[in-house]
């Protein structure tokens, strides 16, 4: 989806996840979309609560991401269709896994609902993914792939 200003300029291109009938997540790349959403809700007189979720997102992007995700979490998350998501229990750690990402490649976003387990998840994925070529990257990595 695109969030635009009154002149059609792009503010952000977030992913919207509908976790329940009355519970949505707006996963943003950057910017002040939280403030924008609060402003829209207040101006429209909506009876909603808008807050930043306590999650830690991790991107798993690239041509081997499905293989790595399958090795880490099994077939069901690895076979998610584009722009779909699922909630997943990883050894008692709640995750939301979506088939989305910023790389224009095959990819997934893993939202860790317990940020204190971030190091554990990172180490686990790096251990499983290293033999398949997984390494830390960032947006500038794309120009070198």
Where are these regions (language model features)?
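Internal amphipathic helical hairpin motif
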Residues: 1-12, 65-95
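Residues forming anionic-ligand binding surfaces in small-molecule and nucleic-acid pockets
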Residues: 10-20, 50-51, 94-107
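Conserved small/polar residues in nucleotide/adenosyl-binding loops
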Residues: 143-145
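Helix N-cap motif at beta-to-alpha junctions
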Residues: 29-34, 63-65, 113-118
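A common structural junction motif
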Residues: 41-49, 76-77, 125-136
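A conserved active-site cap/scaffold subdomain adjacent to cofactor or substrate pockets
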Residues: 106-122, 126
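Extended, compositionally biased flexible segments
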Residues: 1-23, 27-43
């Amino acid at each position: 989806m695109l969030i635009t200003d009154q002149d059609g300029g792009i503010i952000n291109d977030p992913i919207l996840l509908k976790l329940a009938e009355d519970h949505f997540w707006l996963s943003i790349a950057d910017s002040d979309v939280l403030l924008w959403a609060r402003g829209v809700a207040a101006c429209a007189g909506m009876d909603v609560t808008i807050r930043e979720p306590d999650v830690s997102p991790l991107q798993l992007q690239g041509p081997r991401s499905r293989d790595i995700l399958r090795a880490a979490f099994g077939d069901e998350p690895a076979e998610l269709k584009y722009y779909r998501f699922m909630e997943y229990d990883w050894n008692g750690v709640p995750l939301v896994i979506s088939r989305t990402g910023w790389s224009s490649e095959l990819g997934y976003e893993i939202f860790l609902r317990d940020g204190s387990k971030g190091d554990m998840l990172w180490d686990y994925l790096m251990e499983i993914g290293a033999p398949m070529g997984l390494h830390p990257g960032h947006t500038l990595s794309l120009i070198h792939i």
